[in-house]
């Protein structure tokens, strides 16, 4: 359930404004625009890099709900500045 990832009403309102209207491609593009690589997105979401690439290229236009929740959670954390890029897990990043 998407609501379960939000601890505060403020975060829910931010989510509605920033994530709800974005497609999977737009969310991945926004994460990349924040300076993340596909490998860093993988390290922080658990979504394999090939899956991220398929979303980005439009080959997978309807990813699993668990994939969307993971992408949306990372996007929201970055969008609300509650998660600085210096704290990102870069262990799998090349």
From Swiss-Prot:
Disulfide bonds: none annotated. SUPFAM superfamilies: lambda repressor-like DNA-binding domains. Residues 38-57 bind DNA. InterPro entries: Cro/C1-type_HTH, Lambda_DNA-bd_dom_sf. Residues 27-88 form the HTH cro/C1-type domain. This is Putative protein P2. It holds the Pfam family HTH_3. GO terms for molecular function: DNA binding. The keyword DNA-binding applies. Signal peptide: none annotated. Keywords: DNA-binding, Transcription, Transcription regulation. The gene is 2. The keyword Lipid metabolism does not apply.
């Amino acid at each position: 359930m998407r609501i379960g990832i939000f601890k505060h009403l403020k975060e829910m309102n931010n989510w509605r404004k920033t994530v709800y209207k974005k497609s999977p491609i737009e969310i991945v593009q926004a994460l990349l625009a924040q300076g993340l690589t596909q490998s860093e997105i993988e390290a922080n979401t658990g979504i394999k890099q090939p899956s991220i690439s398929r979303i980005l290229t439009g080959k997978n236009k309807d990813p699993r709900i668990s994939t969307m929740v993971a992408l949306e959670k990372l996007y929201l954390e970055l969008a609300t500045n509650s998660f600085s890029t210096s704290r990102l897990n870069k262990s799998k990043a090349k």
